[in-house]
Amino acid sequence: MSIKMKYNLGYLFDLLVVITNKDLKVRYKSSMLGYLWSVANPLLFAMIYYFIFKLVMRVQIPNYTVFLITGLFPWQWFASSATNSLFSFIANAQIIKKTVFPRSVIPLSNVMMEGLHFLCTIPVIVVFLFVYGMTPSLSWVWGIPLIAIGQVIFTFGVSIIFSTLNLFFRDLERFVSLGIMLMFYCTPILYASDMIPEKFSWIITYNPLASMILSWRDLFMNGTLNYEYISILYFTGIILTVVGLSIFNKLKYRFAEIL
């Protein structure tokens, strides 16, 4: 395989499709519901949170079901990608040892697979919009790809860092699980950002995940694109990707011996 072929965009795209397809088949092998789990899982969590926060705690947020799922569904994409990335290189150890290819495609394929699951949840959002007397906006046509690309960049940056470092520090899994749980509650998914006291507003200001969630929510519920939030998402994502690829390129030569 020539160097030119290795880094040809067409080759990389085909490789990404093949690995993503393989991961999908492995995940849903012998599964009765198959891809429906990609919708059922976040929808179940949404029902639980709706019961707790709307019916028990009586949070006063209009159209709370739509509010909840427009934050929870994109969060699920990020959280699942970040968590699964920890073992993406380990799960593909045999391919890494026996085949020469750009290994950074492996965590990227995981991000894309979870992104496909997220796309499967958009019809659910549409249904609930109609239930609450709301309608999708024409701005979705360009807004969804714009924010989705930003989330891919951001999530890939996080994933390449986690997947690389986890080969050398296996305790990282526990820290990541705790970190994701902490960030879930520090991100305005279950509550509105204006419910946070002024002295804690920095939690939103310096949290790029908040920008990501609020970007999706503004688009889905209001049909608007908040370019400030989207810019933060892209800026942070590019920084994380650059840092992640730097770590990956420095350590990738030791992958075979570690695996």
Curated annotation (Swiss-Prot):
GO molecular function: ABC-type transporter activity
Claim: Aminoacyl-tRNA synthetase is one of the keywords in the record: no
Membrane topology summary: Multi-pass membrane protein
Keywords for this protein: Cell inner membrane, Cell membrane, Membrane, Polysaccharide transport, Sugar transport, Transmembrane, Transmembrane helix, Transport
Subcellular location: Cell inner membrane
Bilayer-spanning residue ranges: 33-53, 73-95, 111-131, 142-162, 176-196, 228-248
GO BP terms: lipopolysaccharide transport; polysaccharide transport
Presence of keyword Ribosomal protein: no
InterPro entries in alphabetical order: ABC2_TM, ABC2_TM_bact-type
GO cellular component entries: plasma membrane
Tree of life domain: Bacteria
Residue ranges occupied by any ABC transmembrane type-2 domain in the UniProt entry: 33-251
PANTHER family assigned: INNER MEMBRANE TRANSPORT PERMEASE, TRANSPORT PERMEASE PROTEIN
Function: May form an ATP-driven O-antigen export apparatus, in association with RfbB.
Protein family per UniProt: Belongs to the ABC-2 integral membrane protein family.
Protein name per the record: O-antigen export system permease protein RfbA
Originating organism: Klebsiella pneumoniae
